[in-house]
Amino acid sequence: MKKLTLLALSAAAVGLTGCASLTGGKRIVRISHAQAETHPEHLGLLAFKEYVEENLGDKYEIQIFPNELLGSAQKAIELTQTGAIDFVVAGTANLETFADVYEIFSMPYLFDSEEVYKAVMQDTDYMERIYESTDEAGFRVVTWYNAGTRNFYGKSPIKTPEDLKGKKIRVQQSPASVAMVKAFDAAAAPMGFGEVYTAIQQGVIDGAENNELALTNNKHGEVAKYYSYNKHQMVPDMLVANLKFLNSLSDEDYQIFKEAAALSTQVELDEWEKSIEEAKRIAEDDMGVEFIDVDVDVDAFKQKVLPLHDTMLQENEKIRDFYDHIQEVNQKVKGGE
């Protein structure tokens, strides 16, 4: 089965190699992402498509491929590197391989609040320094999407770190996320997002960690009936572009694509809160998921993993400046309360 998947991806890559091909005189621009067509990220990308085609419709046709149709995020990043795909939405954990600075987003309890998280991410001038860190790899982030707050969910209630002891939990393929779960005395199981449902269903893992949309959009609420708000990470998704494609654009066209990216983020942010509330309603009413909030000992979770901050800073000097910047924003927002 694995061989067939690899062959299919290879065939897709070959088929996409002519990505710069024209249809009716228009340059085809392909965007890959892992989410369903109802997901806020897809809605944001539809706004991206509409804006580009309204302004440059005589030159470009935007094609969006949801649901990992062109492969997992990691595979799609590799295709974006080669130019077989022009854009891909990827988690920061997928970008750590190419630029060490992205590891910081896997640091647990990095942002003191959602207000801090958004203040940092919306500081475009500062974030562009981070975005350019992958230039040598052949791609660059052009904007971010809110991927919410990551929490644990599984087959049994999780209220304290002790409830995770001995459990096998799916995490993103990030060393920091693996270390975090180990700090809770659980076994980390890095795997592709598309494998999680079956892994929980078959008892290969006991749970996972993600935002609430995973329960409904990816049907995880059918196999995991307890969702606990321990709030260990706020991790954005990134819209990544092939650098050669960006550099091939005229100044005027580049500006349109830049505006389209910013618009896609705004649409995604506007849709996010509505989607979360709807996901919670569906998960609770239709899937029987229990949401555990006030009974979760967030501070106990936090104290278990705070030593990871020092460990990560010692092992990766490239995150130091960004870490200090975030701490400054933490203090600034706290002081303004």
Per-region residue spans from a language model:
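Signature of the catalytic double-stranded beta-helix
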Residues: 120-132
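Generic cytosolic/nucleocytoplasmic N-terminal low-complexity/intrinsically disordered segments
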Residues: 1-2, 303
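Sec-dependent N-terminal signal peptides of Gram-positive bacterial secreted proteins and lipoproteins
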Residues: 2-21
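N-terminal secretory/targeting leader peptides
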Residues: 20-115, 125, 134-135, 140-337
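Short, Φ-rich (hydrophobic/aromatic) sequence segments
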Residues: 8-11, 120-123, 326
